[in-house]
Amino acid sequence: MPGGMMADLEAFRKAQRADGPATILAIGTATPPNAVDQSTYPDYYFKITNSEHMTELKEKFRRMCDKSGIKKRYMYLTEEILNENPSVCAYMAPSLDARQDMVVVEVPRLGKEAAAKAIKEWGQPKSKITHVIFCTTSGVDMPGADYQMTKLLGLRPSVKRVMMYQQGCFAGGTVLRVAKDLAENNRGARVLVVCSEITAVTFRGPSDTHLDSMVGQALFGDGARALIVGADPVPEVEKPCFEMLWTAQTILPDSDGAIDGHLREVGLTFHLLKDVPGLISKNIEKSLVEAFQQFGISDWNQLFWIAHPGGPAILDQVEAKLNLDPKKLRATRQVLSEYGNMSSACVHFILDEMRKSSQQNGCSTTGEGLDVGVLFGFGPGLTVETVVLKSVPLQ
């Protein structure tokens, strides 16, 4: 190839890349209207699943709910919907068709609601969105939820779409990692990132032989969160709330089968080992060292924290292992308390909670007054996603 053409190609490639790091420009949220009080949920759950005769199991489930750290959750499944779909209420009854009929409609609809709010906050015309990343663990369909939401929002047909199915609870970090690469390698790109999760795929009646399923029934909630990600924000027009500096993904050693899920005739079943909190807490410091040694940080209390709230035991053990100030996981525990575990969407709810509380409390940055922070996603594998974030000064 002639030297002049090589030089032109190099200049072309360089011109395609952004100058600065990817930033989060807006965040939008959506939940189903049906709010569930955790304190009364055991009575409701055992009644709606025709399991009130299982009194000992009900008391065990009540203890799970009491220890969950959750006050309320939001669920698409109302009493009326469940009464119309008794197969969903049974334990391991063939019910995939009924579940799919719900989620293939509701997942993109809820995602669209969150996306519309993010676009409104961003303040730019939706025609400027160049890429869409849609993530859900709730059902599978073709064309996917990415396509359905694109149509619902009225985005350009040429928008470049990425669909992620069946990633689970670590995927709130995954979508940020992919969005960062897209934004930084495509000058002017504006990436709409949506995580939408509906527990209609996992809801089922109790069983004393499958207690890990009951743990999920005590923890999981529904919600969608959307973000606009882009590099080189337009001054005075776009207002970033966080920058993304570095990302990683790893599979923890000796963790095969620690968390897994399987889509079957009965819906999505999931299994988790008791030692999931131990596996995460034992290995998390290695991920922190890998992420922050390049920034000269080794005191984990210098960071602001956004950790997927898989459950209170994970948070407690991470806190103890790293000697974290209890305030570090305040935003994480707050979201767990108000929404439950919403799988991939959770960490984005925590990002929103942190920036809003930082503003309300008069902090100097969106990261509770700190400059650098970490976002962790934990999920099937056992897989850990790590995102290093930089906060933005608050005026």
UniProtKB/Swiss-Prot annotation:
List the active site.
169
- Job description of the protein: The primary product of this enzyme is 4,2',4',6'-tetrahydroxychalcone (also termed naringenin-chalcone or chalcone) which can under specific conditions spontaneously isomerize into naringenin.
GO-annotated biological processes: flavonoid biosynthetic process; polyketide biosynthetic process
Entry's EC annotation: 2.3.1.74
User: Which GO molecular function entries does the Swiss-Prot or TrEMBL record give?
Assistant: naringenin-chalcone synthase activity
UniProt pathway? Secondary metabolite biosynthesis; flavonoid biosynthesis
Query: Which Pfam family would be a valid example here?
Result: Chal_sti_synt_N
Source species of the chain: Pinus strobus (Eastern white pine)
Q: Which family does it belong to?
A: Belongs to the thiolase-like superfamily. Chalcone/stilbene synthases family.
Catalyzed reactions per annotation: (E)-4-coumaroyl-CoA + 3 malonyl-CoA + 3 H(+) = 2',4,4',6'-tetrahydroxychalcone + 3 CO2 + 4 CoA
Q: Which residues form a coiled coil?
A: none
Q: What InterPro entries does the record tag this protein with?
A: Chalcone/stilbene_synt_C (IPR012328), Chalcone/stilbene_synt_N (IPR001099), Chalcone/stilbene_synthase_AS (IPR018088), Polyketide_synthase_type-III (IPR011141), Thiolase-like (IPR016039)
Key words, A-Z:
Acyltransferase, Flavonoid biosynthesis, Transferase
Q: Which PANTHER family match?
A: CHALCONE SYNTHASE, HYDROXYMETHYLGLUTARYL-COA SYNTHASE
Q: What is this protein called?
A: Chalcone synthase
Q: List the disulfide bonds.
A: none
